[in-house]
């Protein structure tokens, strides 16, 4: 292929004269995106938890949330390392670059970032046609979801990322963009941190119309909220769960979670046809 270049989400330019052949992905969603872009066979390393697609489970592990195994990374001789802007430590990225590795840092904050990242990987991996097709399919599905809920009455939502302590996300998180697609708004959008601990008192003050719990268990955490019967969401029975695996991975599968969230939130509107103002989608 001819020489190509991309600009990562730090603003750093990466140039290549040939497709990357040995790739390490430092986050589960990045591993998945390489497969989506049509280059799963180029992966030589992953971090713990990178379990989708199933083929990824056979890859060598080079670390986890606690840190990276730099000796293992050096031994695998990657010609491209994929890092997650808010999920990998800056010091680790800088150390990899000092070793001479090309590091692409991606930081998805909006639904639109997912197809952009797929296309970017297609450029670097020489799988442009397949990556473009995957990106187009994702955009088409995301657009249909937006149109389905455009103009619906707005619903305020608390997303529970963790129960003890109670952790939620702010308006810059991709989960907030999913909520916007559903015609909803994040009740804690104004938090200064991407993910932060909030108190029960803060939730009582915000009094969201619905609570969405990220969990693989259908009834995870819902019983705990029954201690707060004055919450609108508790009174209305508007406490829902969504697969944490789907909603927290910035890949095409996030739309599976989005479709469930949107349908759950729409059920609140069906119960309260006169509720809130239209969503500004």
Task: Explain the meaning of each model-derived region.
Residues 39, 57-58, 99-100, 182, ...:
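Short, structured coil segments at secondary-structure junctions
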Residues 87-98, 210-227:
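A ligand-binding cleft/hinge motif common to bilobed small-molecule-binding domains
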Residues 12-13, 79-80, 84, 90-167, ...:
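Extracytoplasmic substrate-binding proteins
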Residues 21-76, 80-87, 187, 215:
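A short, structured surface patch at a secondary-structure boundary
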């Amino acid at each position: 292929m001819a020489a190509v270049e991309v600009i990562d989400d730090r603003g750093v330019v990466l140039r290549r004269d040939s497709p990357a052949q040995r790739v390490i992905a430092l986050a589960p969603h990045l591993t998945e995106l390489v497969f989506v872009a049509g280059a799963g066979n180029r992966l030589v390393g992953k971090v713990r938890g990178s379990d989708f697609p199933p083929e990824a489970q056979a890859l060598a592990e080079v670390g986890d949330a606690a840190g990276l195994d730099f000796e293992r990374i050096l031994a695998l001789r990657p010609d491209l390392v994929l890092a997650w802007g808010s999920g990998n430590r800056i010091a680790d990225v800088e150390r990899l670059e000092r070793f001479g590795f090309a590091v692409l840092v991606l930081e998805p904050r909006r639904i639109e970032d997912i197809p952009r990242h797929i296309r970017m990987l297609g450029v670097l991996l020489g799988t442009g046609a397949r990556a473009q097709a995957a990106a187009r399919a994702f955009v088409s599905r995301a657009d249909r979801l937006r149109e389905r809920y455009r103009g619906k009455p707005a619903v305020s939502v608390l997303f529970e990322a963790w129960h003890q302590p109670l952790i939620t996300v702010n308006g810059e998180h991709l989960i907030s963009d999913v909520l916007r697609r559903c015609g909803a708004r994040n009740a804690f959008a104004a938090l200064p941190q991407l993910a932060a601990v909030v108190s029960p008192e803060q939730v009582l003050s915000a009094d969201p119309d619905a609570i969405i719990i990220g969990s693989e268990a259908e009834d995870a955490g819902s019983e705990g909220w029954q201690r707060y019967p004055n919450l609108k969401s508790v009174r209305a029975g508007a406490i829902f769960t969504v697969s944490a695996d789907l909603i927290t991975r910035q890949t095409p599968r996030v739309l599976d979670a989005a479709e469930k969230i949107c349908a759950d939130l729409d059920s609140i509107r069906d119960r309260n046809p006169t509720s809130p103002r239209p969503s500004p989608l």
